């Protein structure tokens, strides 16, 4: 079963369990500016700042959830509308669904951290990665999936590091003394090389997450 079918079925179960009337609940989703999404960061090369990604934010009864997309939009509809989106062939619909799912789960108290960290928080988070990795895995070779500059810069000084990304403007460039490799062309080589994979949650929205769910090595998702 497709992962989005699993997620949709899960949301349906929660709607029934908590008696959420699908026709009466409104979800408002809008695209955020980079300042709204990530604030004033030390680094200015985050994909959302340079215009390579767009943040969707869903608001469900005051609870907010976010997801990345490549297409700006506004949307207002019910949970019934969200559950009817095309999650197989439409990347924008997938992002809208994930943002909405995050908002609903936040509202129900089933998760937290459903919005992106802002201002100096990406740096604070990234600085914790090396200690965590060393404590859990010793001295592994690390594959980072997705261009996240703070994480790359903090990990590469402590561990052998390779980075995969799908954006052609990043691929084959050197960033923070690390070559950014092609997420399709170099996938097999990088994944077979790595002992540990640090993977962006954006892989769920673009459906490339299927390439990382069944790996015979530890995979940690961020964002």
Where are the language model's segments positioned?
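Electropositive, gly/pro-rich neighborhoods at or near active sites that engage anionic ligands
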Residues: 1-149
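Flexible, charged surface loops at secondary-structure boundaries
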Residues: 49-51, 133-139, 156-157, 189-195, ...
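Glycine-rich phosphate-binding "P-loop"
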Residues: 111-122, 171-178, 195
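Residues at the starts of beta-strands that form the adenosine-phosphate
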Residues: 141, 160-162, 218
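Short beta-strand/turn micro-motifs composed of small residues
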Residues: 146, 165, 223
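Gly/Ser/Thr-rich loops at beta-strand to alpha-helix junctions
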Residues: 147-151, 202-205
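Histidine/lysine/aspartate-rich catalytic loop segments that bind and position anionic ligands
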Residues: 150-181, 185
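Accessory, usually C-terminal, subdomains that scaffold auxiliary metal cofactors
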Residues: 177-223
């Amino acid at each position: 079963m497709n992962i989005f079918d699993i997620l949709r079925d899960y949301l349906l179960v929660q709607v029934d369990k908590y008696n959420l009337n699908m026709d009466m609940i409104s979800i408002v989703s809008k695209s955020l500016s980079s300042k709204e999404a990530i604030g004033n960061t030390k680094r200015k090369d985050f994909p959302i700042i340079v215009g390579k990604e767009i943040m969707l934010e869903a608001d469900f009864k005051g609870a907010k959830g976010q997801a990345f997309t490549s297409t700006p939009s506004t949307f207002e509809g019910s949970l019934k509308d969200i559950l009817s989106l095309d999650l197989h062939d439409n990347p924008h619909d997938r992002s809208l669904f994930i943002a909405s799912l995050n908002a609903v789960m936040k509202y129900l108290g089933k998760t937290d951290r459903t919005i992106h960290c802002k201002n100096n928080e990406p740096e604070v988070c990234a600085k914790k990665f090396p200690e965590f990795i060393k404590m859990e895995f010793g001295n592994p070779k690390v594959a980072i999936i997705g261009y996240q500059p703070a994480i790359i810069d903090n990990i590469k000084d402590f561990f052998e590091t390779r980075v995969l990304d799908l954006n052609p403007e990043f691929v084959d460039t050197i960033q923070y003394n690390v070559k950014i490799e092609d997420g399709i062309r170099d996938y097999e080589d990088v994944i077979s090389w790595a002992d540990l994979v640090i993977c962006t949650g954006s892989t769920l929205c673009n459906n490339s997450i299927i390439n990382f769910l069944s790996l015979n090595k530890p995979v940690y998702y961020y964002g």
